[in-house]
Amino acid sequence: MSLTKAIQDYIDKSPYLTNIDVELATMFNDAGEWAVALEHICTILAANDCALSSQEMAELESLINKTKKIEYEDFDDAFLNAVKEVSNTYSSRTSV
């Protein structure tokens, strides 16, 4: 499966993205701007305090790692770290 298709599948099934978020992420993804698409997704997840499950986090990290393997794609880890922080904060609140 191509990276573009894998990211689009993630975008399409994400319950956390609004229609405009989907449109923007799809636009970046279709242009081959995979890192930008994933950074946009991470920004939305963190800004909306979305606590991802371990499976959701693993899928997101897998896409990011695949993107990083492409020489000219630079993903800023600060975006993923923000999602992890939110997920850890909110998952610990709900598990108490």
Model-assigned labels for residue ranges:
Residues 1-96:
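C-terminal-biased regions
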